[in-house]
């Protein structure tokens, strides 16, 4: 029985989730670090969060800090929960380094798209004085996990077991419930949430396409090695 458990694909997926563990540890560490900076050294919270107006003015360092900074415990726990549920399966198919890079790259791409692509729409929707004071870049990475999870399903090898497929489908249902289902107590207008979901999804799709291209570029005749005469 124990031997079957050791040989099961699901257990192998969980034990190989080093990139997932790294992402969660980084998010928790940065939460404790920034909490110390804001509470002990009294650094203003707004200096660390993603701010559309500030990023549009050129404060691009906010793109980095907003990815790993959460000023509240609830959105952090939601993000970590979804990462723990979905990322091990994605990591099993694409590898730990690619997962970690995709998670943070999708956040940065999503933030830039959110600010520079839809900044004008956001401003015209909720007003010039009140439009989106701050946002969490890590949340955009959560939205980006859906295209990556679909990619994990499409990659044939290594194959998922039936149990792994069931858990992944259940994780996707949890993902839509926690990540996409609108919350009644959210302070943001619905259009802002929809735009953030769109930006996260597009950034995840972009990362998925890059992964597919890198996995298959040697199969393209242009890049394949030509036989020597």
Label each region the model flagged.
Residues 1-15, 172-229:
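C-terminal transmembrane module of polytopic alpha-helical membrane proteins
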Residues 4-45:
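N-terminal signal-anchor transmembrane alpha helix
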Residues 38, 118-122, 155, 182:
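Short helix-capping/hinge motifs at transmembrane helix termini and TM-loop junctions
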Residues 90-93, 150-157, 206-215:
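Structural signal for the C-terminal ends of transmembrane alpha-helices
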